[in-house]
Amino acid sequence: MFQIRDFREGDTDALYDIALRSFDEYFDPSVFAYFRTQWRTGQLVACDVTGRPVGFIAGTRIESRKVRIMLFGVLPEYRNKGVGKQLLDAFRMRAMMEGYISVILEVRTSNTDARRFYLRNGFRETDILMHYYRDGGDGVRMAAPVQMNQ
């Protein structure tokens, strides 16, 4: 079991390192501060027993009843150990408690592991996004209710 907590100002360097090891695309580390201004409670960090961040999820509010996962990363050595599921469940619980009913995200079509993870966790693929990424890669939009039993 991993500790899930809110993002803290001092987390930026660790989360940026996780992002560099998780994503194919470069982005500016200031995005963490930006997302925090968009929806403070939608920024969660998973820590190991020593308190070191090993994963994170960053979301924003996009409509009156919908939230969007913008970034979701877990260190490679911590994947398939339940970190991602704990983060996603905590994110959905936060969204539900604030009255949101659905969550969306985008993922590369080539990222089959992530797509399987989301499908196992109640998401469905809703759109193919041709040339969605800067390098021309295609994406898939996925959506799910915030409550797992819906």
Summary of predicted features, one role per range:
Residues 26, 81-82, 136:
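Non-catalytic, surface-exposed connector residues within folded enzymatic/regulatory domains
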Residues 11, 111, 138:
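Acidic active-site catalytic centers that drive phospho-/nucleotidyl reactions
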Residues 52, 71, 75-89, 96-98, ...:
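Conserved glycine-rich acetyl-CoA-binding loop
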Residues 62, 84, 135:
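Short, conserved glycine- and acidic-residue-centered signature motifs
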Residues 2, 6-77, 88-90, 94, ...:
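Acetyl-CoA-dependent GNAT
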Residues 106, 119, 124-141:
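Conserved catalytic-core motifs of GNAT/GCN5-like acyltransferases
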